[in-house]
Amino acid sequence: MFFHKKDPIHTVKIDEPNPRFAQLLLEQFGGATGELTAALQYWTQSFHCENAGIRDMLQDIALEEFGHLEMVGRMIEAHTKNVDQTEAYKSTLFAVRGVGPHLLDSQGNTWTASYVNEGGDVVRDLRANIAAEAGARQTYEELIKLSTDEGSKKTLVHLLTREISHTQMFMKALDSLGKLTDPMFGNIQPDN
């Protein structure tokens, strides 16, 4: 069902490795609004969705998020692997765990499935996804501001751009259901 294509959609090229920046990147690898969370959230939601078009969209975006996870992982690896290990170990997380990506956020908290937000209702899930993409975008914007490496910035801008595209896709799906601006979902109407 899956094929790992060796040619990335966007080439990750780091000009100036910085292990401390790699620690910040862990937020998008093993953090609550990171790529692993998004991929698993959208993939799981797809099995609850009876609308074939929206199910396919959720699975397509989930697979793209796995590609983003790979890009972030390669960035973390490049920022930690090819530098003086004294520098890498100045970052506490890499001193304890070793170089490269880990299922941790930037503060060392372990990734948990409780980050995955799925509820079995397509409208609820699409709204949760729009919020999740907003969290990812905010994190990418902050990482771009903090990065001093042009190669890192290019990859982060690419990832930010794709998150915006995902938000637009989720909004279009909600609109197709007539629920983009409707605050209600479900079948029970509130009392007057």
Regions found by a protein language model. Give the residues of each.
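Non-heme di-metal
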Residues: 1-192
